[in-house]
Amino acid sequence: MNDVDIKTREYTTVSEVAGPLMVVQGVEGAAYNEIVEIETPAGENRTGQVLEVKEDIAVVQVFEGTSDLNTESTKVRFTGETAKIGLSTDMLGRIFNGIGKPIDGGPDIIPDQELDVNGSPMNPSAREFPAEFIQTGISTIDGMNTLVRGQKLPIFSGSGLPHNELAAQIARQAKVIAEDSEFAVIFGAMGITHEEANFFMNEFEQTGALERVTVFMNLADDPAIERIMTPKMALTTAEYLAFEKGMHVLVILTDITNYCEALREISSARNEVPGRRGYPGYMYTDLAGMYERAGRINGKEGSITQMPILVMPQDDITHPIPDLTGYITEGQVVLSRELDRTGIYPPVDVLPSLSRLMSGGIGEGRTREDHSGVSDQLYAAYAEGRDLRDLTAVVGEEALTDRDRKFLKFADEFEDKFIRQSKDEDRSIQETLDLGWKLLSILPKTELKRVKDQYVEQYLPQSETEE
């Protein structure tokens, strides 16, 4: 676009400023998602994006907020471009704000390539089925809710639960075993407090994990509009590293609830008709557009795996945010307040947790041939032990049979030995499966009906087996 075009698309016709939005009248040729440059009456430069166009009226969201803007002397220039981010492998080890500007004191990135942050949809016929195991070092995920390369597996948490610690541990420990390809982590934080931001930064820097991590950080006191851009910046960076540089990328996004609250705030400012619990009706489409940027493409070496984290309001798994997320993603890892109260970390409740693509990433040649059977048997035994624990609270332990007492003991040991691990404990998949077998040895061998007999003979610690 030449200078004349730029000049003719500069307007001082702002008619309204409301919340994060401003309305510009008399606009020619404005387009949805177009980037605008804003000059405040004090001469400060800001950036915005067109949200809506109707005839000659454009509604613009301002990334840095609308404070100090007025309807008399605010200048708005329409650039004819969509939001883009300059990308380079030098972004690994760097920290950016929610709109991609460095905030770690380092130099600006010299980009190898610029990409639209809205991404381009993957052709469904070009998608490759997610496969290959990603080891997180956490037994409840690796052993029973396996994360597979190219999958989207959210973590459902509650206020006050240690999801931040779990996210940092996964970012630090995650790896693709038996692969020579490079592995990277993109960490996108939305609406987090300064205390949480300091925790993540200290965690990444002190453990040396930052060198393979790119961080996009939007704080709670940053504009809500920036919160909408943060996951787009993170996912565009992931697409560049995965599909242009052939890396395996794990994207951790926290907190999706804050992202959806920002959607609701902007929707309210636009006077849109609200949907369930005040959230916009297009929230499902918006979340799907974000989650579906995970995956693998035929002929491409790299992959994008997503682990979004969301805090369920009032621990309500039927709330629209976890509800819609569950429709789109391929399972969920659920954190339990009850386990957290007993001091167990990570407090993963395996019974409502699920990885729908687990079968594609486990077994001989990927993890171990007994993995599926061990997982099924652990689920069955723990579920029965939990039921017996509830029964014991009613009838007392004296009413239980010897068999029942063994399942009850198994449930206690499972929580204390398998679920519980320290925040810096990185268990291999072999250690996780061996631990599972050790716990199953508490039960009579005749109860191990979900594992093939040959694996029982091969892996069950014989000295501890009770017939």
Swiss-Prot record:
Lipid bilayer topology: Peripheral membrane protein
Ion transport among keywords: yes
GO biological process: proton motive force-driven plasma membrane ATP synthesis
One Pfam family it belongs to: ATP-synt_ab_N
Example of a GO MF term: ATP binding
Source organism superkingdom: Archaea
UniProt keyword list: ATP synthesis, Cell membrane, Hydrogen ion transport, Ion transport, Membrane, Transport
Localisation: Cell membrane
GO cellular component: plasma membrane; proton-transporting two-sector ATPase complex, catalytic domain
Membrane in keyword set: yes
Family, as annotated: Belongs to the ATPase alpha/beta chains family.
Function: Component of the A-type ATP synthase that produces ATP from ADP in the presence of a proton gradient across the membrane. The B chain is a regulatory subunit.
Quaternary structure and partners: Has multiple subunits with at least A(3), B(3), C, D, E, F, H, I and proteolipid K(x).
Alphabetized HAMAP family for the sequence: ATP_synth_B_arch
Entry protein name: A-type ATP synthase subunit B
Gene behind this protein: atpB
